[in-house]
UniProtKB/Swiss-Prot annotation:
The gene is SNRNP48. It comes from the Eukaryota. It comes from Arabidopsis thaliana (Mouse-ear cress). GO terms for biological process: mRNA processing; RNA splicing. Zn(2+) binds at C101, H107, H117, C121. Disulfide bonds: none annotated. Keywords: Metal-binding, mRNA processing, mRNA splicing, Nucleus, Ribonucleoprotein, Spliceosome, Zinc, Zinc-finger. It is found in: Nucleus. One of its GO terms (molecular function) is zinc ion binding. This is U11/U12 small nuclear ribonucleoprotein 48 kDa protein.
């Protein structure tokens, strides 16, 4: 029996489902092509992927910009990991540097000029005028010091109201109304100075500087390995530390060799990171507070060092110092106090981190100064205080500089924290008051710089809040008067004396009924008034009250007001020149009837007069029988009638003037026609009222449209 032939391993019984490529070509010929794949089912064609789109020039530029931004971000993170100060990246020379404007990255300037530049950047914004109202903190840096006795263990409480101009919460300077909030103006700003800080001031006697000098003479240096460990330790501080290591202790004890100019420049440059751009005066105030807190921290660290020296001896002393940690309650207290003072200007969060970072910077600077085996290039060129650090002995003797020169920042290079400086209670109080004053200036600057239009909901919410606050303020003041009643212009009260009396239920119901009727009548009359007209009427009403009270344009109270319309109620329209002068001269010598209003207008005026008589009589009857009605209702009706009467008169006068101009042209023709027919003319003069007779009369075309009138 024959064996069935076997299929090759690369063949597939169903080529439409699976396809295996043939085995590698055994032919070494380079130009050999493998056989094409078998045909597939037309329903199973695969879609060939489209080629990638060609990028345009704009897309390429955007990709390059994103790449550059990523590179810049990487460099920034690298510089932060290396603990590089961003202010040292833009070195101007050995004594100064340039900083970048936070509002325009193309502007570079010295740190001392950044504050004034920020008030003019951009060019459309100019806030220099705000410095005129807040400038007292610039003059309180050198206050006199008064020597006092030790205050004991209690804290000092000092008032700050006399040390700075905090302004007043006035919307209007000359009005004692509810536009001024008493809880804000009545708030007294005080400073509480803890005992651990007050004893470090120069005002008090009993300072223990001799003890600290003894400890500083025995201070140990910091090894390079300890410096790295100390940096890692303080980088982990996210809150006020409850304890620190011996390396931090040594850095705090040796912090008096840190240069003042370096710390001042750091405060001035890095204040922008915490949201506020400060000037050199504010920098000096902040540095004074920091230096006071540092003195208490150094005093506590010296106490820890003296305790370790008394308990341990020799090698055990060194090993115990390297491995032990020290609880620091005073360090926490002074940090909290400094953060609370900086929170006035920077806010609670930024003030806390700013105070903590200042101490971190000081500790790092001190450790780099007291570090053993330093290179010559890392030593300060203008220090002159620490001469020999390799032998772990810090010489705290008075070192006389030849001539301390001033750098570009205005500070004296060579002065360290060990240099004598008067830190009095008055200067500390002035520094805290400067923070309050500077915060008010910062609020005004931000209100102008970051001004944004409020939404309708925000405006309504702010209006409701201010209204509720004003109501609360009015309830606290029994002698509150509206603004219009101030300045000697009391408003005219209602003439109805019944308003001050207790009213019965019937009177109240009658008033409510009258109010509804008046509202319905106003709704029908004033429906065509625009909001502008309503506001105009309100302003006129208040203006009348002010004039009656002796206000604008009146030298005495109660002077009669001039009518708002050019025509008085008891004056004729001819007195104001509404008639044509030339026509009057021509008709003055003729014996004829003067021109009057047209018949329909005259009838309307008669109706108005009859209505006036009826209303006056009815108002008298109502006043005699119903005394509970308000007089303002009659005043409103009379005012409306006067306005309507005035408008009708103006319209009639305009029609009359226009008619006179037409009749004046044909008057000469009329005279010639009268001379030709003298008999008819005499008849017209003898019977001037024949126009009202019921008998028909033949008149010419001119007489049909000419109506003689009586003399006014």
């Amino acid at each position: 029996m024959d064996r069935p032939p076997s299929l090759p391993h690369y063949q597939n019984p169903n080529p439409n489902l699976f396809y295996h490529y043939p085995p590698p070509n055994s032919n070494p010929n380079f130009f050999f092509r493998p056989p094409p794949p078998p045909l597939q089912n037309p329903n199973n064609y695969s879609i060939v992927p489209s080629p990638p789109p060609i990028r345009e020039l704009s897309g390429t530029l955007s990709s390059l910009k994103s790449l550059l931004s990523e590179c810049q971000r990487t460099l920034d993170s690298l510089s932060q990991n290396l603990a590089l100060d961003h202010s040292s990246l833009l070195q101007k020379d050995e004594n100064g540097c340039f900083v970048r404007c936070p509002f325009d990255s193309n502007h570079f300037m010295p740190p001392e000029a950044l504050f004034l530049h920020s008030l003019r950047c951009p060019n459309t914004l100019d806030l220099i005028h705000l410095l005129e109202s807040f400038s007292s903190y610039r003059n309180t840096l050198e206050l006199p010091c008064e020597l006092q006795l030790n205050n004991g263990d209690g804290d000092l409480c000092i008032s700050l109201d006399d040390l700075a101009d905090f302004g007043s919460n006035f919307f209007y300077r000359d009005c004692p109304g509810a536009v001024k909030f008493s809880e804000l103006d009545g708030k007294k700003r005080t400073l509480t100075l803890p005992h651990v800080l007050s004893v470090e001031c120069s005002d008090f006697v009993g300072s223990d500087e001799k003890v600290k000098k003894i400890v500083l003479d025995k201070c140990l240096g910091v090894l390079p390995s300890d410096l790295c460990a100390m940096k890692n330790e303080i980088d982990q501080w996210r809150d006020f530390p409850s304890s620190y290591s011996s390396s931090v202790l040594s850095s705090i004890v040796g912090s008096k060799v840190v240069e003042i100019s370096a710390l001042r420049k750091w405060i001035l440059v890095n204040s922008t990171r915490y949201g506020v751009i400060i000037d050199t005066f504010m920098r000096d105030h902040i540095f004074l507070l920091f230096r006071l807190c540092l003195k208490s921290a150094v005093k506590e660290a010296c106490g820890f060092r003296m305790e370790s020296d008394a308990t341990d001896v020799g090698e055990q002393k060194i090993m115990s110092c390297k491995s032990s940690t020290f609880e620091c309650p005073v360090f926490i207290q002074v940090l909290s106090w400094l953060a609370s003072q900086l929170a006035v200007l920077y806010g609670e969060g930024n003030g806390k981190f700013f105070a903590l970072d200042m101490f971190k910077q000081c500790i790092v600077e001190s450790a780099s100064q007291v570090m053993l085996f330093r290179l010559e290039g890392t030593r300060s060129k203008c220090s002159g205080v620490v001469e020999d650090l390799d032998d772990a002995r810090l010489r705290n003797k008075d070192v006389i500089m030849e001539k301390p020169f001033e750098n570009s920042s205005g500070g004296e290079c060579g002065k360290t924290l060990d240099s004598p400086q008067v830190i009095s209670v008055s200067r500390v109080s002035a520094a805290v008051a400067a923070l309050y004053e500077r915060s008010l200036l910062e609020e005004k600057i931000r209100a102008v710089r970051y001004a944004q239009p409020l939404t309708r909901y925000q405006r309504a919410a702010e209006l409701g809040f201010m209204t509720a606050k004003a109501d609360e303020e009015r309830n606290r003041r029994c002698s509150y008067r509206p603004i219009i009643d101030h300045d000697g212009r009391p408003r005219q009260r209602s003439l109805n004396q019944d308003m001050d009396k207790m009213k019965t239920r019937e009177e109240l119901l009658a008033e409510e009924r009258d109010y509804k009727r008046r509202r319905m009548s106003y709704r029908g009359k004033k429906v065509k008034r625009t909001p502008r007209q309503v506001l105009h009427d309100m302003i006129e009403e208040y203006t009348e009250e002010i004039k009656l009270a002796g206000g604008i344009g009146c030298f005495e109270k109660g002077m009669p007001l001039q009518s708002r319309s050019p025509i008085g109620n008891d004056q004729k329209e001819s007195d104001f020149g509404y008639s044509i002068p030339s026509t009057d001269k021509q008709w003055k010598g003729e014996n004829r009837a003067d021109i009057e209003y047209p018949i329909d207008n005259r009838q309307n005026s008669d109706k108005v007069k009859r209505h006036d008589e009826y209303d006056s009589g009815s108002s008298q009857r109502q006043q005699s029988h119903r005394s509970y009605k308000h007089s303002d209702r009659r005043d409103d009706k009379l005012r409306d009638r006067r306005k309507d009467k005035h408008n009708d008169r103006r319209d009639d006068e305009f029609t009359r003037t226009k008619r006179h101009s037409i009749e004046g042209e044909s008057y000469q023709n009329y005279r010639s026609s009268r001379e030709k027919s003298s008999s008819d003319y005499k008849t017209k003069r003898d019977d001037p009222y024949d126009r009202r007779s019921q008998q028909p009369r033949n008149q010419n075309l001119f007489e049909d449209r000419y109506i003689p009138t009586e003399k006014e």
